[in-house]
């Protein structure tokens, strides 16, 4: 029973150190903008995995890549502070 408790507790803490969100462009003209897509889940998944996430997909209504389980140090777009220079 104690082992099960430790496993559940460890899984909880692993989940706490991750975030979900829209990854942003690092450089160039669109620095600070969400990564655009139309229907290409494969490119979004690859981009998210390069940034340390577990999975990614093209969120169709926002026309932007969305990543799941990103590390906390990976920059993501925020509605309040998002500054897109395009």
Swiss-Prot record:
GO terms for molecular function: sodium channel inhibitor activity; toxin activity. The keyword Magnesium does not apply. GO terms for biological process: defense response. InterPro entries: LCN-type_CS_alpha_beta_dom, Scorpion_toxin-like, Scorpion_toxin-like_sf, Scorpion_toxinL, Scorpion_toxinL/defensin. Keywords: Disulfide bond, Ion channel impairing toxin, Neurotoxin, Secreted, Signal, Toxin, Voltage-gated sodium channel impairing toxin. Disulfide bonds join 33-84, 37-58, 44-65, 48-67. It comes from the Eukaryota. SMART domains: Knot1. One of its GO terms (cellular component) is extracellular region. Residues 1-18 form the signal peptide. Expressed by the venom gland. Its main location: secreted. Residues 19-85 form the LCN-type CS-alpha/beta domain. The keyword Metal-binding does not apply. It is found in: Secreted. Binds voltage-independently at site-4 of sodium channels (Nav) and shift the voltage of activation toward more negative potentials thereby affecting sodium channel activation and promoting spontaneous and repetitive firing. Has the structural arrangement of an alpha-helix connected to antiparallel beta-sheets by disulfide bonds (CS-alpha/beta). Belongs to the long (4 C-C) scorpion toxin superfamily. Sodium channel inhibitor family. Beta subfamily. This is Neurotoxin LmNaTx17. The lineage of its organism: Eukaryota, Metazoa, Ecdysozoa, Arthropoda, Chelicerata.
């Amino acid at each position: 029973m104690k082992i099960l408790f430790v496993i559940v507790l460890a899984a909880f803490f692993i989940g706490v150190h991750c975030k979900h969100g829209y990854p942003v462009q690092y450089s160039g003209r669109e620095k600070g903008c969400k990564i655009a897509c139309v229907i290409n889940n494969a490119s979004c998944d690859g981009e998210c995995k390069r940034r340390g996430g577990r999975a990614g997909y093209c969120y169709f209504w926002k026309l932007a890549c969305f990543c799941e389980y990103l590390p906390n140090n990976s920059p993501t777009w925020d509605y309040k502070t998002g500054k897109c220079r395009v």
